[in-house]
Amino acid sequence: MAHSASPSLYRSPQEAMEAPPEEFLYLACLHEGTGVDAPDFLAVVDTNGGRVVHELPMPNAGDELHHFGWNRCSSACHGPDRSHLIVPGFRSSRVHVVNVADDPRKPYIEKVIEPEEVVAKTGYTRPHTVHCMPGDNIVVSMLGDADGNASGGFAVIDAKTFEVKGRWENGGERPPMNYDFWYQPRKNVLVSSEFGEPNAYEKGFDLADVEAGRYGQRIHFWDLERRTLEQTVDLGAKGLLPFELRWLHDPDSEEGFVGAALSSVLWHFHRANGAWAADPVIEVESVPLEGWPFPVPGVMSDLVLSMDDRFVYLANWLHGDVRQYDVTNPAEPKLTGQVWLGGVIGKPTDGPRELNGGPNMVQLSFDGRRLYVSNSLYSSWDNQFYPEMRSWLTRINCDPNGGMELDPGFFVDFHDRPDGPARAHEMRLQGGDCTTEIFQ
């Protein structure tokens, strides 16, 4: 059981796996790029009925809601329970503090941190990943400076007052770029990845920008207590655009995974002889396609690790498949399941309906049985690669012993809406999920 004072915070992965099934989830939905002149919104989706039961619009248009997270998670399990979602605008650099404690199914905006304040106190823009940390801190990875150039730092927000406190890193060397991050308290380490320069990716993808070094290929290891950069691992040509990082949930582990989106390679990082190393363990082959100037890469856009660290699920946004691998031995993953959900290479879609777009974000329930999938990556990239995109949220049923199949009864359509189409991006499950919880 969870702590009595913190009913949705857990002392161990096993405790989280025993939590009741989620009844609803929160979903970041955007109008940016759709032609609809309206603010983005946070949707509340009933996971039993597969329908939107509440929408919380942001106060301004043009935010590009993307990733978001809790003010508290299990790494701070000895304090108050989670009560707020921190919802940044990836394009606007505006940060919304959303109260989910008073009525979890009808959240409301409690505070808005304007981009001018973020820049004044940190010098950073383009907030991405949100993680709570012990000590009443919320840490947010920041991808740009005030002019849209690449930057490799982090912002800190007070988890009680929601005031911006400044930069997280403690001086010294900083990476040239940033994107996702994860940390292991017992091992005193934080790892961060790289996307690219906002001035490059915001306008759409151009291969020339990769060749010009405007996109990343490195992961970085930090001393968590000292908040200083300790080591950088360059992944090279097989590590282009290292997006999402997933440390094993075991708090004593010294290994995890990162997905290189453009190279479509899953890397296994680990500590070896006192230093950090990374090895490619899954390589998704590019597919020749008529009309394309180069073979189509999978674009490994997201991955999630089951709470028991047995399975990793990854999405290939352009190819259109979601894969399940047994990673009992993290250095030698074994494919155990695959579902097709759209894509550009012409594979038939599993299930009762044709899908436009490809699987982008994935989120897994604590018990490892329900995998939620959405299809918007980033507005300008959506329009470039899927100009006729119709956005959706669907669910895959996962066998905890291996294997998975599409749930034909769960489908949320975000295209045919009274106010015009929207696009679905990241999900947060009621009471936490497999990419929010870090254990001490």
Predicted regions and their residues:
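Short loop/turn segments immediately following beta-strands, especially the blade-tip
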Residues: 44-49, 97-108, 159-162, 223-227, ...
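Beta-propeller blade signature
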Residues: 40-46, 151-162, 209-226, 387-400
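Blade-loop segments of beta-propeller domains
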Residues: 51-129
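Asp-box/WD-like beta-propeller blade repeats and closely related beta-sheet repeat scaffolds
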Residues: 100-185
